[in-house]
Structure formats: C-alpha cells, structure tokens
Amino acid sequence: MRTTYMAKPGEVERKWYVIDATGVSLGRLSSEVASILRGKNKPQFTPHIDTGDFVIIINAGKIGLTGKKATDKIYYRHSQYPGGLKSRTAGEMRTNNPEKLLELSIKGMLPKNSLGRQLFKKLHVYGGSEHEHAAQKPEVYELRG
C-alpha cells in the first residue's frame, strides 16, 4: 500500500519571485501571492509544512481598485484607548501607505496561526520599482489571467 507524500522542511527548495503590481486588481494579486507563499503551486504541497516561495511585490502604489472601492472601502484600526478608532479609505491607503494595503489584503488570505505568521515573513512589498533583493536573483512571475 502506498502512503501519502509529506514534504519535510529540510528538503523544500524555495525560489524568489518578483511581481509587478501596476494596474493589477488588488484581490486577484493578493490571492495569487497567498497561494505562492503557501506553496500551493507546487506538487509537493503539504498543508502543515512551509513549502512556499519568497515573493517581492514592486509598484504597490499603482495597484488597481475596481468600482468605488477607493472611496467606499474603509480600513479600521483602534489604539485601545477610549475614542481611539481610526479609519482610512482604500484610496487614502493607496496614496499614503500602499505597502500596508497589500500586506493587509494578503495577510487576510493566509492561515491564522503560527504557520501563517511564518509564511507572511517571506513577503516583501515595495511602493516603487526598486527592491533590495537583487542578490537572490528573483524570477519575474507572470500572473494568471
């Protein structure tokens, strides 16, 4: 009888991918990046092992928001002090802090446990077209669709 293949942490080969976010829809990009971080695009995917690759996203400030999300989608945060609720629209976040906009979107698509936190550390988001990971020789990743 055959047993199910389970990847071991030591035998996982990781690649570095660079993705250009110019004009790409936020949700479509986020779901694909979450899948790469998780390793679901590999045949040796194992749910409880980090089999994913590293992802560099450039031009985060040029991400696309469809419909009226730029004005209607609101992100909330709270300082834990009375009256400390802060809110920002997606358009304001895209202008002021585009890296945070993408990170929040991708983090919400990863597991909510210690593995998810480990996967999130392999994501690097940059607002401009320059990144500091040239030494890793990242491959350009073409998005599906």
From Swiss-Prot:
SUPFAM superfamilies: Ribosomal protein L13. Keywords: Ribonucleoprotein, Ribosomal protein. Gene3D superfamilies: Ribosomal protein L13. One of its GO terms (cellular component) is cytosolic large ribosomal subunit. Pfam families: Ribosomal_L13 (PF00572). GO terms for biological process: negative regulation of translation; translation. GO terms for molecular function: mRNA binding; structural constituent of ribosome. It comes from the Bacteria. This protein is one of the early assembly proteins of the 50S ribosomal subunit, although it is not seen to bind rRNA by itself. It is important during the early stages of 50S assembly. NCBIfam families: rplM_bact. Belongs to the universal ribosomal protein uL13 family. This is Large ribosomal subunit protein uL13. It comes from Listeria innocua serovar 6a (strain ATCC BAA-680 / CLIP 11262).
